[in-house]
């Protein structure tokens, strides 16, 4: 910590990232001395949104650097899933971002444009709810609904993995302003509904979860939604 003091004295404008180190360095004193912190050692795994939601209770979102590792081979659903996960904090882009198709670049730019509109909610808002029914992260099956509120505006991040069921979020008194998703969705009667997947997952049950068979893709569904009080 004394070394950090010397570094900041020598370079007052330096931006310091605190390496997560498995969570060992996420403590108030050190976090008060750095600009940002890797939210976790999780890098490309499907569990990132669930880990990020848990860590949001410990690290302020304005300091929580969340990986969005984007690959050219990823489906559009996987790309949206990764970007929406990173919207719980400071987006850290990685992967094949300099070598992607025009269509994939456009999808990423759309997500970053949405994030620019809600980043004040991310940084300064209060967590309104984290509803996650996934019981085993290493073979996740289920969905998570993350809500953050700032004034009259509400950010809703939905992640569904392997579970093909529709996801419904009651939001009485709100109206939608913008969405970032590749899934079909509706907002009727004060209920946000992410449509059911068209696929059925294939895998084997493991510790209250579902592991895909070798060569079988996971079913990724996600969306970021901005609402305001009506």
Which residue ranges define each predicted feature?
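Short secondary-structure junctions
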Residues: 125-129, 133-135, 176-182
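Glycan-recognition surfaces
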Residues: 1-99
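A glycine-rich phosphate-binding loop feature that marks nucleotide/adenosyl-phosphate handling sites
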Residues: 17-26, 101-105, 129-137
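C-terminal beta-sandwich/jelly-roll accessory domains of carbohydrate-active enzymes
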Residues: 162-230
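Catalytic cores of secreted or luminal carbohydrate-active enzymes
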Residues: 80-131
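Generic hydrophobic alpha-helical scaffold/packing signal
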Residues: 4-8, 109-112, 157
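Carbohydrate-binding surface patches
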Residues: 136-175
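Short, Gly/Pro- and small/polar-rich lid/capping loops
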Residues: 8, 131-133, 220
